[in-house]
Amino acid sequence: MSIATISRQVRHALPDIGPEPTRTATRTPSRDHLRAVPTRTTTAFHGVPRTVSENLGVPTLHRTVVDYANFDHAASTPALESVKAAVDVALRTYSSVHRGSGYASRITSGWYEEARAQVHEFVGAREEDLVIFTRNSTDSLNLLARSLPKSTTTFVFESEHHAALLAWNPSRTVRIPVPASVQDALILLEDALRRAAATTTGRRLVVVSGASNVTGELWPIKSIVSIANRYDARVVLDAAQLAPHRKIDIEALGVDYVAFSGHKLYAPFGAGVLAGRADWLNDAAPYLRGGGAAGEVTREQTVWSQGAARHEG
């Protein structure tokens, strides 16, 4: 049974998302109530998925409780009730992944790989692309940074999120000034790549966020890819902010890698993805040495796994 099938079953088992009783007037809570995590009864909206924190109340200095309004989605989204229910179903047969031959382990390993296949489809990856599970977007970008060929020069705008700005080898990184406009960004990028092509050799990688976590501005990914291709540069798309709002299609966009986090897509914290071309990842030293990263270990040598297992540990 696939995760998708389980999710559908869970959704059917959930109560209908209909209107709930209108919230009552603000009242003064007891001292014991303030010590606990308060909850509220609010009005639900038709067609809007429920989150685990939608009835959260916030105690005020005036000893009242007000509804919690989440304006922090760019940092982390609340988990969906359907996600919570699906996790609960999966936990009933949870066991080790690819580390056992027992019944529960085989079920969990199957779901794990089914989830990988679904992510592969979700991001529109090429057939030969790898999908590697990580902790979050920052972890994904650091994994790629550790996997770059030694001669790689990285190009990154100074306006990038710290995860995309700081992961790379400083001595091999070209920082592009904050652009004044979209057109300015394209001009600055091409100028940086042109100068590098005239003075250096080796691989090149352009790092770009699909959407700004500060302004919400959408970047012209296809135009950036077009410029990068002229200088034989690869492109990694930091889609942490883009994935929750726009369809991600690696093949259609022409990017080489994409990184994003589950906790910005209504899942709990602790899951991320790096998807993209396999060659650099298969040639690199394992990101996490041990566990499934080792295909064979003898006194004389260690043979590292290929594919996603090489870096998932």
Regions found by a protein language model. Name each.
Residues 2-23, 27-313:
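Pyridoxal 5′-phosphate
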